From Swiss-Prot:
Domain RWD: 9-111
Disordered: annotated span: 132-167
Listed InterPro entries: RWD_dom, RWDD4, UBQ-conjugating_enzyme/RWD
Family annotation (Gene3D superfamilies): Ubiquitin Conjugating Enzyme
Official protein name in the record: RWD domain-containing protein 4
Originating gene: Rwdd4
PROSITE patterns tied to this protein: RWD
PANTHER family from the UniProt entry: RWD DOMAIN-CONTAINING PROTEIN 4
UniProt organism field: Mus musculus (Mouse)
Amino acid sequence: MGANEDQEMELEALRSIYEGDNSFRELSPVSFQYRIGEDGDPKAFLIEVSWTETYPQTAPVISMNAFFNNTISSAVKQSILAKLQEAVEVNLGTAMTYTLFEYAKDHKEQFMENHHPGNSATPVANIISVETPTTAPSSKKKEKKEQLSKAQKRKLADKTDHKGELPRGWNWVDVVKHLSKTGSKDDE
């Protein structure tokens, strides 16, 4: 049997085994993803297996570069990939995609024992702020400007000059008007 015939048989088997399984996804006839763990599980991860042209005589390409795995540290990812690579070497020459997915499911706790959700991986935003100079955080704390409606902006523009400043003396008290309201000392 040739490599293409083996691949076609394995593809048919995978489709029938994982029919209706939300964790399994066929990206292409030679590339598959499987989510190990339930939805919302902080220790869940995604494995992508891509077949080469000579698969199963040669090893498939195993990847954990999916966005789903961004919370997992690179050390844990490398550890998982190394253990999966050992399983590949044992099964070389046979259809192994199903075997790899099941191996990962069976050893999930062992794979993720060094993974501490929330602590192990730094989100991309933190990586960027760590690499930028210390002056960057102060620029991020700019005050939010108040959102004004068109009418409010127009009213404000009518009261202010071209720089947005109120004219000199806008809050001055009209002395004559003020004195006429208060009265004189003689009236007392």
